[in-house]
A protein has these predicted regions:
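Polysaccharide-binding surfaces and accessory modules of carbohydrate-active proteins
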Residues: 3-5, 9-13, 17, 31-263, ...
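Conserved, mostly hydrophobic/aromatic
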Residues: 18, 164, 288, 334, ...
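Glycine-rich, aromatic-flanked loop segments that form ligand/cofactor-binding clefts
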Residues: 72-74, 79-117, 242-261, 299-324, ...
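Short Pro-Gly-centered flexible turn/kink motifs
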Residues: 98-105, 283-302, 730-737
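Carbohydrate-binding surface patches
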Residues: 242, 644-687
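Aromatic-lined carbohydrate-binding/catalytic grooves of carbohydrate-active enzymes
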Residues: 325-462, 475
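Active-site neighborhood of glycoside hydrolase catalytic domains
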Residues: 392-394, 426-428, 432-589, 601, ...
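C-terminal beta-strand-rich structural cap/linker in extracellular carbohydrate-active enzymes
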Residues: 703-741
Length: 741
């Protein structure tokens, strides 16, 4: 790992054993994009990668250089209005009404390690030897605006972390109207755009399409990262698959409004950008103030989509997630929501807990309805005190009874919201985001608290800290069940209302930081009506997230498959739920529900007391199996093998760190008759090691399993006979492969 500056060509080269990032100071003083990809040997002379040509019908920076138009030059920080007519990465409104900037290279420095980003989540290092950071300073002399571009390269992995700081060293007020965390110009357009898209209950489905001239973009203006579009995109070569081919991806470590775009120009250049959504954003930067953008993490891979994912998984699991629970296997939990909804008593909860404890469950989670006047979703949010009619012995009393049964205790909260029917709203109606004289839109009968205000965040912190102070609560599910509308703060002047969306997220991060610091033993799981704020920013505070409100096994296979493009299995909340499923009314086998949920944190969301004796025995076996192998599921190396978006059969697998144990999940959506012979090519095994299949006892070498494949042929091949074992729709199997010593 090194960062080298070549003075002759004014070229910076960041590189490690696997990746290089090269940029240069351009003749006009800005920064140019030269290369990002496989590691190149360092040398003088990379400036030949800077290409320019005269283009007709354009404007040029220098009067005597007809071939120097910014519209035809690859740049790192394009700005508005000076011969580049593509999308800018920085747009600053000045007091005279101009948005023109001429950012000139001023200086540079290299720091060992990686600096923290003030008030924002970001990847980190535990030792300065793990990374180096290049900080380049640019200055616009007329305004006094100083911009610092931060580039971090890690000792291991194919990732580059980027962000930007804007400092007003001038005498006039500036308005930041667009501040991208990342902008890079790529020298060709032979890419397909891969995004994770969807909606509530079908989050992060994989969609892929060719780039074309013009702009391809995703984003969110909902006040949260959203289930419609995840803050992640990958540019993949057309021939790229899960196992081979080139990928260039970007993931934004942010939980609020964002935009990502690829602009393909008319001369074969692709501009890739990611950052805070510029619509509804206007940040006043007074003299002496600094604005820090969120971090964007670039990843390059020549080992297909799985190679890209492995880089994100390792980085986000080890150097984005933090705290006590980062490296711990997660407790097997039961959540009462789909078992009771709001209709519960302490007696009913303890009855569920009794059966759960007998099955080996480790954590009992009490969901919505335990606080304030909360007997439905019409009241109570904002009043974080126990409802004595529901829990006559309080949270601590119930927790002690749960602990006496051998389990830990957790609760559900929704700290960012308030019902109008609540003591908090009646006392502070100005604490909600709303515009005076206009209607307040409601979602799930609730309003959004103004987390851009410190007094609001302080109040919620004090309420929550009082609940957690006894130490009886060991897990918190932090929900958020509506998007932001009427985004107007009663505490800010008119000129600063464009800051509210971002200040809200900063307030959210502040509350998370204070609670996780004060109560480090608590496992926080983020949630937003399922996976509608499943993003890297949340993983910095909560090492796992509820992946989707849709707990149907078949739907979850697509959701978890897509989520794994960027996020590790240890971050995915995954539960076995009741059938018929409450979201899609589908009936799936119990073993398929478990086989799907294993590839995540694992838990149950149903009343175990309503299961048959045979089903209870199966649940006990499932829990025992997960306890034996959860280290591999949650912290092993994950591979996607067959896509549910392309095939009737899906497969994925986890491999232990020493590569001596592998667990393959195989799932068929619809049953077939007289089907073909079937096999699945595996990955990540030791080629010369003999593995034994725990299902059949068959033994195969790793190279055979990876190149020929694991044979999955069953009774659907040929005419079905009962003696061959009848199969059904929504069937699944697990194959545990152990190295033969």
């Amino acid at each position: 790992m090194n960062i080298v500056y070549h003075e002759k060509g004014k070229v910076f080269h960041l590189f490690n054993d696997t990746v290089s990032y090269i940029l240069m100071v351009l003749p006009h003083g800005g920064l140019g994009s030269l290369y990002f990809g496989a590691a190149l040997r360092d040398r003088e002379g990379f400036e030949h990668l800077f290409e320019r040509a005269h283009r007709g019908m354009t404007a040029c920076v220098f009067a005597d250089s007809r071939d120097y138009s910014l519209d035809a030059i690859r740049q790192e920080l394009p700005t508005y209005g000076s011969s580049d007519f593509r999308r800018p990465a920085l747009n600053v409104l000045q007091e005279n009404g101009s948005r023109i900037l001429d950012l000139q290279f001023k200086d540079w420095r290299v720091e060992d390690g990686k600096p923290k980003l003030a008030g924002l989540p970001a990847t980190y290092v535990e030792s300065p030897s793990e990374a180096k950071t290049l900080i380049i300073t640019l200055e616009d002399a007329p305004t006094g605006l100083c911009v610092e571009l931060l580039y971090t390269i890690f000792a291991e992995g194919n990732a580059i972390a980027r962000s930007m700081r804007c400092h007003n060293a001038g005498m006039e007020m500036l308005h930041l109207q667009k501040v991208m965390s990342l902008s890079i110009d790529l020298p060709d357009t032979d890419y397909e755009w891969l995004e994770l898209t969807g909606a509530w209950a079908r989050e992060r489905h994989v969609e892929r399409r060719a780039l074309a001239t013009g702009i391809t973009a995703i984003g969110s203006r909902r006040g949260h990262s959203s289930g419609q579009y995840n803050p992640f995109v990958a540019l993949v070569r057309p021939e790229t698959t899960e196992m081979q081919g080139e990928v260039l991806a970007v993931s934004l470590v942010y939980s609020g409004n964002f935009e990502m775009l690829a602009e393909v120009d008319n001369h074969g250049v692709t501009r890739l950008q990611a950052g805070i959504h510029s619509t509804d954003f206007d940040w006043t930067l007074a003299t002496g103030e600094t604005f820090q953008t969120p971090e964007a993490v670039l990843v390059w891979s020549d080992e297909g989509l799985n190679g890209m994912s492995r880089t994100y998984h390792r980085l986000y699991q080890r150097r984005l997630a933090r705290g006590t629970w980062r490296d711990k296997v997660r407790p097997i939990l039961i959540n009462n929501w789909e078992a009771t909804y709001f209709d519960f008593t302490e007696e009913k909860l303890l009855a569920i807990a009794d059966v759960a404890a007998q099955c080996g469950v480790e954590l009992f989670v009490l969901d919505d309805g335990w606080f304030g006047a909360r007997t439905s979703d019409h009241a109570g949010l904002g009043d974080w005190t126990v409802n004595p009619d529901r829990l006559p012995n309080g949270i601590d009393g119930l927790a002690e009874k749960i602990e006496a049964r051998g389990m830990k205790f957790g609760i559900w909260v929704e700290l960012e919201m308030v019902n109008e029917d609540s003591d908090l709203y009646r006392a502070h109606p100005d604490w909600v985001l709303s515009v005076p004289g206009r209607r307040k839109s409601l979602g799930r009968s609730q309003c959004v608290l103004d987390f851009s205000r410190q007094d609001v965040v302080d109040n919620i912190y004090e309420q929550m800290a009082a609940i957690l102070a006894s130490g009886k609560v060991s897990y918190v599910k932090w929900d958020m069940n509506r998007s932001i509308t009427e985004c107007w703060s009663h505490a800010l002047p008119a000129a600063r209302q464009g800051e509210v969306f971002h200040r809200y997220i900063l307030g959210l991060y502040d509350l998370y930081e204070r609670l996780t610091t004060a109560f480090p033993h608590v496992l926080f799981e983020s949630c937003a009506s399922g996976g509608n704020r499943f993003d890297p920013g949340m993983l910095y505070y909560a090492p796992q997230a509820w992946t989707s409100d849709n707990s149907d096994a078949v739907e979850r296979q697509k959701i978890q498959y897509g989520t794994s493009m960027c996020y590790p299995l240890s971050s995915m909340g995954s539960h076995v739920s009741v059938v018929p499923n409450h979201q899609v009314n589908r009936v799936t086998p119990l073993h398929t529900r478990a086989n799907t949920a294993y590839f995540g944190t694992f838990g149950y969301e149903l009343d175990l007391g309503k299961l048959s004796a045979e089903e209870i025995a199966e649940v006990k076996d499932e829990i025992a199996f997960m306890k034996e192998y959860r280290e591999i599921f949650q912290f092993g190396t994950f591979y996607r093998l067959q896509s549910p978006f392309e095939h009737n059969v899906m497969a994925w697998m986890c491999v232990s760190g020493d590569q001596k144990t592998a667990i393959v999940g195989w799932y068929r959506t619809l049953n077939r008759v007289n089907d073909r012979f079937a096999r699945v090519r595996l990955a990540g095994l030791l080629p010369d090691t003999l593995y034994e299949d725990s299902r059949s006892g068959a033994r195969c070498y790793g190279d055979e399993l990876m190149h020929y494949g694991l044979i999955t042929t069953d009774g659907t091949t040929g005419e079905p006979h009962p003696e061959d074992g009848l199969t059904t729709d929504f069937d699944s199997r697990l194959y545990v492969l152990n190295a033969v010593e």
